[in-house]
């Protein structure tokens, strides 16, 4: 198993090296398990990756190329969901995902804003993100990492809570910190 994980890590390293030579920005979707990363990935890319309410429904990083509104291509990566107190035996399995996240130009931190545990889950994800090395550009320079919170599952909120969340998100959106969406319905996702 360790040899297979090392082989996967080596292969992904070669892919990342090749991508660094291509001037496409990369966007990584990260978040707690079941936050809706795969549903958002499908919405953004027109893909049909498995999106289920299951622990580890996504077991590997999936990438697709999209066109940004300005017509510029970008690579979007759907990653494995995080969980609290990940068993030590599984940490190694997640290393490849974390390496992909470390290379991203933009990290979309997808949160299940309807979950009563959303704030605690966000702290868990943020703690992991702080441990990831700063990405390096094609010439060895440190790249600036930008993180945008995506408050997902607004469709599951009661009307009063939804109005409050949308107001908070709008204030943070103007600062480039958060957006509120429903990946399921497409609400809040601009073409």
Label every model-predicted segment:
Residues 68-73, 94-177:
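Conserved C-terminal guanine-recognition region of P-loop GTPase G domains, centered on the G4
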């Amino acid at each position: 198993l360790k040899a297979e994980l090392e082989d996967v890590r080596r292969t992904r390293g070669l892919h990342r090296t090749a991508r660094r030579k291509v001037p496409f920005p990369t966007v990584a979707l990260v978040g707690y398990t079941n936050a809706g990363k795969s549903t958002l990935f499908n919405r953004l890319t027109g893909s049909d990756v498995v999106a289920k309410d299951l622990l580890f429904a996504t077991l590997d990083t999936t990438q697709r190329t999209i066109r940004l509104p300005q017509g510029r291509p970008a690579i979007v990566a759907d990653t494995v969901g995080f969980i609290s107190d990940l068993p030590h035996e599984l940490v190694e399995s997640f290393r490849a995902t974390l390496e992909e996240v470390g290379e991203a130009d933009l990290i979309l931190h997808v949160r299940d804003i309807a979950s009563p545990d959303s704030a605690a889950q966000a702290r868990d994800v943020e703690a992991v993100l702080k441990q990831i090395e700063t990405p390096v550009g094609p010439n060895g320079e440190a790249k600036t990492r930008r993180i945008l919170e995506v408050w997902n599952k607004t469709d599951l909120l009661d009307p009063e809570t939804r109005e409050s969340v949308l107001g908070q998100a709008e204030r943070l959106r103007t600062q480039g910190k958060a957006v509120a969406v429903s990946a399921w319905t497409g609400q809040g996702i601009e073409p």
